[in-house]
Amino acid sequence: MRVLGGEVSPFTARARLALDLRGVAYELLDEPLGPKKSDRLLAANPVYGKIPVLLLPDGRAICESAVIVQYIEDVARESGGAEAGSLLLPDDPYERAMHRFWTAFIDDKFWPALDAVSLAPTPGARAQAAEDTRAALSLLEEAFKDRSNGRAFFSGGDAAPGLLDLALGCFLPALRACERLHGLSLIDASATPLLDGWSQRFAAHPAAKRVLPDTEKVVQFTRFLQVQAQFRVHVS
């Protein structure tokens, strides 16, 4: 399989983490992260023109990171490759629904708030974005308490992360870069002790070590995005 994506893209990391956890060999086809879309990307994802895109061996394409992760899980289950301790989604229908719900929350609420911290046009907007990020993390702290059953990961297991772990874990490099750039503490032992422990366990997992980009690389990319955002403000 091949993945159209970017090394520092958190959504690409989410798809790659799922492939890595499932032991699926793939090739990362690097796409430039900018306003100009390649013909290859537009052909693979003509609806949104966004990464990541999972290119199947037969030429078909699957878009959107959360959809890609669930596709990988569905294939593993149908082929008999999903064992009880390595499921990305729980067997229980209610728990599956809850994991999907919180994945949507991360994408719709947490990530836009975190992204706005670094790209906010004014100090006031940045302070509001940081407050929104902390509010989202507070809710995710409670979600971890409810979903993990006292275990290491959101998945409810100690050995392997699941869908919800990948959904939040793919943003850890961006979160740490944001903290470093702006002198913030967003996930820490005082405000979110459960997430603090989880973040350390997730970052130490072999799949995360293989896939997640170095924080400094994300810092440099974020600075590039900040310059772009400032330029757009000046020319608008």
From Swiss-Prot:
Keywords, alphabetical: Transferase
Pathway: Pigment biosynthesis; anthocyanin biosynthesis
Cited Gene3D superfamilies: 1.20.1050.10, Glutaredoxin
Pfam families documented for this protein: GST_C_2, GST_N_2
Reactions this protein catalyses: RX + glutathione = an S-substituted glutathione + a halide anion + H(+)
Biological process according to GO: anthocyanin-containing compound biosynthetic process; glutathione metabolic process
Ranges of residues in domain GST C-terminal: 92-221
Cystine pairings recorded for this chain: none
Binding site for glutathione: S9, K37, I51, E64, S65
GST N-terminal domain segment(s): 1-80
A cellular-component GO term for this protein: cytoplasm
EC number of the protein: 2.5.1.18
Transcription regulation keyword on record: no
MF annotations from Gene Ontology: glutathione transferase activity
PROSITE patterns: GST_CTER, GST_NTER
Family: Belongs to the GST superfamily. HSP26 family.
PANTHER family in UniProt: GLUTATHIONE S-TRANSFERASE U17, GLUTATHIONE S-TRANSFERASE, GST, SUPERFAMILY, GST DOMAIN CONTAINING
Protein name listed in UniProt: Probable glutathione S-transferase BZ2
Originating species: Zea mays
